[in-house]
Amino acid sequence: MKIGIMSDTHDHLPNIRKAIEIFNDENVETVIHCGDFVSLFVIKEFENLNANIIATYGNNDGERCKLKEWLKDINEENIIDDFISVEIDDLKFFITHGHHQSVLEMAIKSGLYDVVIYGHTHERVFEEVDDVLVINPGECCGYLTGIPTIGILDTEKKEYREIVLE
């Protein structure tokens, strides 16, 4: 299964549209968004996504109840929470925005997860720590680093591919 991974979209509509187009072209079945959508209006863009969404709230996401409601309106299978533990293709995932550093570190060290995915720092990370894949897709918006990125994880091969949005 292919999983699209993104974070820190920060209202950047052109890059959100590019990411959705890539995810649709790649036939991803699920998109993980690690938070910081920021404004509610960006959720409407995800109506064009041909996959369900697993998302976390970021520290810049305000209207949490409405955010959850709007995501559910797009697809009843969409979920959003502060921390998510989910199994996909026999892999155990922990997903968070990443602004609670101690929680992130505990998840990585716990031995409970195969994959830990987070955002918040806007810095790209792909590493293996004690048999745990640790992924930060960087920032979709490109505001801090100047390099807008998303990623695709192939769960069968356990391979991650970074994509720079141009």
From Swiss-Prot:
Activity regulation, per record: Competitively inhibited by phosphate.
A Pfam family: Metallophos_2
InterPro entries hit by this protein: Calcineurin-like_PHP_lpxH, Metallo-depent_PP-like, MetalloPDE_YfcE-like, MPP_YfcE, PdiEstase_YfcE_CS, Phosphodiesterase_MJ0936/Vps29
UniProt GO MF annotations: hydrolase activity; metal ion binding
Positions bound to Mn(2+) 2: 36, 59, 97, 120
UniProt cofactor note: Binds 2 divalent metal ions per subunit. Most effective are nickel and manganese.
SUPFAM superfamilies (UniProt xref): Metallo-dependent phosphatases
Superkingdom to which the source organism belongs: Archaea
Documented EC number(s): 3.1.4.-
Residues bound to Ni(2+) 1: 8, 10, 36, 122
Keyword line: Hydrolase, Manganese, Metal-binding, Nickel
CDD domains per UniProt: MPP_YfcE (cd00841)
Cofactor(s) named in the record: Ni(2+); Mn(2+)
pH dependence: Optimum pH is 9.4-9.8.
Complex and partners: Monomer.
UniProt-listed NCBIfam families: yfcE (TIGR00040)
Biological role: Shows phosphodiesterase activity. Hydrolyzes phosphodiesters bonds in the artificial chromogenic substrates bis-p-nitrophenyl phosphate (bis-pNPP), and less efficiently thymidine 5'-monophosphate p-nitrophenyl ester (pNP-TMP) and p-nitrophenylphosphorylcholine (pNPPC). No catalytic activity was found toward cAMP or cGMP, nucleotides or phospholipase substrates such as phosphatidylcholine. The physiological substrate is unknown.
Family membership: Belongs to the metallophosphoesterase superfamily. YfcE family.
Record-given protein name: Phosphodiesterase MJ0936
